[in-house]
């Protein structure tokens, strides 16, 4: 247990040190080239800041969340019998979330 605690403390110290070094040594240039969008070497045409639809962002977010939940299911299914209660609770929670998204119309793929 002591070794695990030492590894955790060492990892956190190393993480903080790398973050601090990155913050101190990075170049903070906010020129025109830094804040503009890069489109394969061509000059951008039009307003770039609102170039994506929030609908696709929400769909991506739901995909990532459900994908992570499926990965958690795989870990629960290979464990012992006592974890099936946790599996059923998580499954009911995910089905409830899926039903709410369907009810509010968030699963429509049409723009």
From Swiss-Prot:
EC number: 7.1.1.2
Subcellular location, principal: mitochondrion
Subcellular location: Mitochondrion membrane
Gene3D superfamilies noted in UniProt: NADH:ubiquinone/plastoquinone oxidoreductase, chain 3 (1.20.58.1610)
InterPro entries the record matches: NADH_UbQ/plastoQ_OxRdtase_su3, NDAH_ubi_oxred_su3_sf
Domain of life: Eukaryota
Key word Transferase present: no
Molecular function as annotated in GO: NADH dehydrogenase (ubiquinone) activity
Catalyzed reactions per annotation: a ubiquinone + NADH + 5 H(+)(in) = a ubiquinol + NAD(+) + 4 H(+)(out)
Keywords linked to the UniProt accession: Electron transport, Membrane, Mitochondrion, NAD, Respiratory chain, Translocase, Transmembrane, Transmembrane helix, Transport, Ubiquinone
GO annotations of cellular component type: mitochondrial membrane; respiratory chain complex I
Family matches, as Pfam families: Oxidored_q4
Topology within the bilayer: Multi-pass membrane protein
TM stretches of this protein: 1-21, 56-76, 85-105
Single GO biological process annotation from the record: mitochondrial electron transport, NADH to ubiquinone
Family to which this protein belongs: Belongs to the complex I subunit 3 family.
Function as written in the Swiss-Prot or TrEMBL entry: Core subunit of the mitochondrial membrane respiratory chain NADH dehydrogenase (Complex I) that is believed to belong to the minimal assembly required for catalysis. Complex I functions in the transfer of electrons from NADH to the respiratory chain. The immediate electron acceptor for the enzyme is believed to be ubiquinone.
Name the UniProt record assigns to this protein: NADH-ubiquinone oxidoreductase chain 3
Organism of this sequence: Caenorhabditis elegans
